[in-house]
Amino acid sequence: MQTKELLKLVENVLDERKGQSISVLDVIGKTSITDYMVVVTATSERHAKSLADYVLIAVKENGLIPLGIEGQQGSDWVLLDLGDVILHVMTAQSREFYQLEKL
């Protein structure tokens, strides 16, 4: 799967599952670890886990294996490393506190 296809898949799953304020950050040339970071707001910790789980299922159904997952159990920030795309699922409070888009 090409990077743009993966990015679109992630965005579609997040939108279908009611992720809020989906932001795609193009970090090509700014970091060597990924091409895109996706930041999305979840309505609760349970919703954050659910969003990450649905993306994980969709990615696996397309033959990809995630490189890493952090913060799945009772966390206000779940990180899913898909290689060329890194997904940050955060509650509104965490997103406001960390302000990843401003880095």
What role is predicted for each listed range?
Residues E61-I69:
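Active-site phosphate-binding and catalytic loops of NTP-dependent enzymes
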Residues V39-T41:
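Short hydrophobic/aromatic beta-strand micro-patches
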Residues S32-D35, D81-D84:
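A short, glycine/Asx- and small/polar-enriched loop/turn
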Residues M1-G29, T43-S50, I57, E70-G71, ...:
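Long, contiguous binding/interaction regions
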